[in-house]
Amino acid sequence: MDRDVLEKFIDLQDKENDIDTKSKIYHEVTDRGSVTPTFNQGSSGMSPKSVGSSGRNKNIQLQLTPTKADPTSTLDSHPLKGDNSDQDDITGNMKENEDDVSLGSGKVTVKNNGNGVSAATNGKGGNQELGIRRSNTWKRKSLIMPLMSPEHTVKQQQRQSYQQHCKPSESVSNTPLGRKYRSKLDRNDGQKSVRSSISSIGSLLPDGATTEFSASPATKLKLPTTTTDTAKVVPSVSEDDNDMESLLQSLANKELEILERTRRVHDLFRQIKIEDKIIKQNAEELQQLKKKVSRLVGNQVQGQNSNTTLPAESHGESNNAETADNKSSSLWTKSVSLLNQFDQIIQGTVETKLGLGDSGSSATENQSEGKPKGDDNAGSAIWSLVNEFKNGLGLLATEEEDADGSIGTIATGLATNMEDYGTRKAESSTQAKEIEMYHYSH
């Protein structure tokens, strides 16, 4: 692109945005170091105060960081600078002379008028023209060096002059080396104060008493060993002090040991009490568990005994009923058979009697021969029937006796079982008591 085209483009942009980029900026430096720019009309004849139909004022103001009017004063006021004696001459010459500071391709001229200081810049480029970057870093030896206003420099000069009058050896007190040196001086001052206090104490001591000063503030007194009254009252302390210190230290150690032992004993007593409570609780829980176990065992034993006795009783009753039924059935069967026999005998006798009238002489003969035999048979049958009845009655009596004996045996068995249960329960209770006594004894 040509330069003319670029300038035309810039002019168009200035007209659209109501800005004049060709105006010259003059900087005015006030007493405190703040820079206020003032605008003059450029080649285009436009000013920021008169441009615009709506009458808007668009003032361009540049705010710069406050710097010192004279860079040489900042260099001389730096603590690394050895001598500060020429600062008064420099400040005096600032009011009369004019200093030129070259900044690259441009120059900054600082002039002192009656009311204040004015500065003007000439050169190429916007940044070089304003001198923004160079104003912040005027010949600084290091970036650590702070930028200070003139008021601050005046106060610092007064403080430095006061320090030089009071303590000329502490002119570099603000630097790290100066701080170390100052701490050493303070330490020496403390030792001097200790020595002065010791000397005052020595003035109050009696004649012949001397003091020895060591590095520590503690002092040792040496009393005279002459034959004065003070020597009689106060013996030599240098040897006894060591003995007394050792004795006191041993005494303190013994007291600490005794206190620790007593504390341990108290702790052990507390632990013993806690363990006793735990043992009592465990014993109570054990007794309750024993009671529960004994109840469960008793219930199980009673259930087993009831289960064994009931089947035995039912079995015995069934056997007795079967035997009684068998006996009764045999008795009645025998009686029925005897009755049948007796009926047959009677029937035979009746038939023989009826046959006598119908039959002839042969029948009479046979009947005469058979009569004694039939009579003998009937008599024997009757007597056998009577004997069987007697035997049946005797069997019933024996069965009743047997039933009574079985009931007695069942009762005796139950009694023996109850006795066994009682003995077992007594043994379990005695064992529980023995365990409790063992726990309480131990």
UniProtKB/Swiss-Prot annotation:
Composition bias, Basic and acidic residues: 16-31, 183-192
GO CC annotations, alphabetized: cytoplasm
Polar residues bias (residue ranges): 56-76, 110-121, 155-176
UniProtKB keywords: Coiled coil, Cytoplasm
Chief place of localization: cytoplasm
Short name of any one Pfam family annotated for the protein: TDA11
Protein location: Cytoplasm
Coiled coil: 270-300
Origin superkingdom: Eukaryota
InterPro entries to which the protein is assigned, alphabetical: Tda11 (IPR031388)
Signal sequence coordinates: none
Annotated protein name in UniProt: Topoisomerase I damage affected protein 11
Region named Disordered: 16-138, 151-194, 298-328, 354-379
UniProt family annotation: Belongs to the TDA11 family.
Compositional bias annotation for Low complexity: 42-55
